[in-house]
Amino acid sequence: MRLSFLSVAIRASLAVGISHIFTSQVLADVATNSEDAPETTLDTLVIRSDAYRTTATKTALDPEKTPMSYSRIEQETLQQRQADSVASALRYEPGVSSESRGTVGIFDEYTLRGFKNYSNFYDGMRLPYDGTWNLMPQVDAYATEAVEVLKGPASSLYGYNEPGGMVNQIAKTPKNTPENEIRLRAGTNNLKEIAIDSTGPINDTTNYRMVALAREKDGQMQTTEEKRVLLNPSIEYKPSNNISVLANLYYQDDPHQVPSTPLPSVGTVYKASYGKLDADAYAGDKWNDFSKKVFMPSETINWKINDLLTFKHTLRYTDADAQQKNTYHQGFSEGSDSKLIRTAYTTDEKMTNWATDNQLAYNLITDNTSHNLLLGVDYQKTDSTAKYADAMYNGIPIIDLSDPDYDLFSKTALSLTGYQQTDDIEQSQFGVYLQDEMQWNKLTVVAGLRHDDYKSTTKTTATGSDTKTTVNEANQTSGRLSALYQLDNRFAPYVSYAQSFQPVLGVNYITGEAFKPTTANQVEVGIKYSSADKATKATLSAYDITRKNDKVTAIDWTKQTQTGETTSKGFEISADHRFNDWLNVGVGYGYVDAEITKDEFHPEYVGKMPQQVAKHKASLWAGITPNNKTILNLGVRYQSGMQINQANSDTLPSVTLVDVSGSYQISPTLTAGLNVSNLFDKTYVGSCYDRNNCWMGAERQASVSLTAKF
């Protein structure tokens, strides 16, 4: 029952959160005044520890001096934009197509500079994904201090990755000043949420933080629901200014989430005999469901050995599992444009992962030149099992989209024995990287090189066939060379060359050999600007990416070879300006010209744009502060239509959406908030993979909140 679930979750979260809040208040009273940080008033207060390192370089290099496209979305912005996920956090990021499946929240999916990306990072280390089904650990936006976006290839620091870039979520960490927050939120789709964030000192050397959340709401699609509970305690021990030890635990339980159940293009993109479907249309059944649990403890050591030498070590363990019950369809029954022929399937996935990253940094200064040398060694090992069972259309009832009945499945008679497959996968990666960050007068040069040894062993047992073992390996060296020069007028042009690779699982149908990794390279030029008073910041970048060794279909999806190539050329503009004390405006635009440049088996696809990529994306975000108690925000985002299929036989309509948010400080400790995304409730199709698989865009979501800070 929904109420019983929320009741238990709220009580658990309150018990943990209030106990920590109470503890922090008592201990803060006995803490020495010398531990209290000085109070500073800024437009947006951003506190970063001495150990902070950016995603772009794994160093503390100022973003204005970083010779590549890099941005950071702070927690305050995430809350203003009602972001509960990475995908929603990227709505206003140029060059990024996010929420292409707006009704689905089981994984964070987006394209960066024209390339699909499923691999997210958490505190600088990859969240594991074995490349099979849907078990992808997620970190809720409320437990995230910031989201950092690095565009372009990043394999010289992070190993295998898609060439469009990477997204890194920065965890909330303990602070040495008491801060406590309780937030209540309610909204459309029966949204109910309580969130707690408490931090402060335990004693002179130890700080804690506890982040907890319980959320439930109805899913956008009919009869679906979403529930989440997370606990994220952390503790930092700092016996001196030279060493700190951080222990972090992230636990998330999603007992109910909305699976990815596609709709046909008829009724969504195209008008059917009964008209068009609403945004909450669903081709599934009440039987459909998705659940996931993630348990991630980690520890980080930062050690300042001396003024020139520092060491950072991180170790993380992940234990995750996911169960799915879902349907897909084979098109309409003969003579109908509303009755879908469906089948049912289940997936049962389990995964464990060990990951470590170790960095030694040495600051060498010679005459007018400084070298920040970084030597790193990282390793990760993933063991996973994915079980798949499919009814193969045996006894699965048809659904009539014009008059849907979502309670057609007989759970006792449902047979999933038409086809079954089990994949046992072992993956490992060992990487060594070296980077020199050189600064000479106004010139910054970043040069990096990394070598990776990757291996994946997959044992597949399927109905009607013997067990098959496939071994995919990648021994790859990736590099990056970038330079930026700061002019006297505060403009800073830069140029960058970077490489990436991505392992490909499976066997080449023609050669019988294991697939090789895809490889990519990018050339990027750009210019940055930052005014002396920091009121204006802007970045203009242009890029050219080529990826080789793409998989292409030889006969059908089970028989593939590796002779494809994809290129993506484009440019991005982002600018923020604070006009005065009460008006801030940010604008962004991204142009992506991605196309398939090689496909020997399907020459008709050459020159076509990949699916789920928007060629144009533009946005505007304005923040208004009429007084010291009121904040108003208005956002407008435009996205051009994506292609309906690989052949580009049609283009989806473009869409313009409006978001608003605001807050009012009722008292020094109490603030009321309002957030509305898709203000005018625009019904649109988020994306299609082909004419049989389309997903609606996110409908209007509104919420009110009450936040107590003390």
Identify the residue ranges that each predicted region occupies.
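Acidic, small-polar-rich N-terminal luminal/periplasmic segments of exported/outer-membrane proteins
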Residues: 30, 38-177, 182, 500, ...
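Surface-exposed extracellular loop regions of Gram-negative outer-membrane beta-barrel proteins
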Residues: 255-269, 383-385, 480, 484-524, ...
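Gram-negative outer-membrane beta-barrel transporters
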Residues: 442, 544, 562-647, 671, ...
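Structural signature of Gram-negative outer-membrane beta-barrels, strongest in the C-terminal barrel
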Residues: 238-240, 351, 368-372, 378-382, ...
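Outer-membrane beta-barrel translocator/receptor signature
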Residues: 128-129, 142-145, 156-233, 237-243, ...
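Acidic/polar loop-and-plug regions of large Gram-negative outer-membrane beta-barrel proteins
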Residues: 215, 219, 232-238, 242-304, ...
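Membrane-embedded beta-barrel scaffold of Gram-negative outer-membrane proteins
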Residues: 302-304, 308-316, 320-326, 517-600
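Face-selective signature of the C-terminal outer-membrane beta-barrel domain
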Residues: 297-320, 342-460
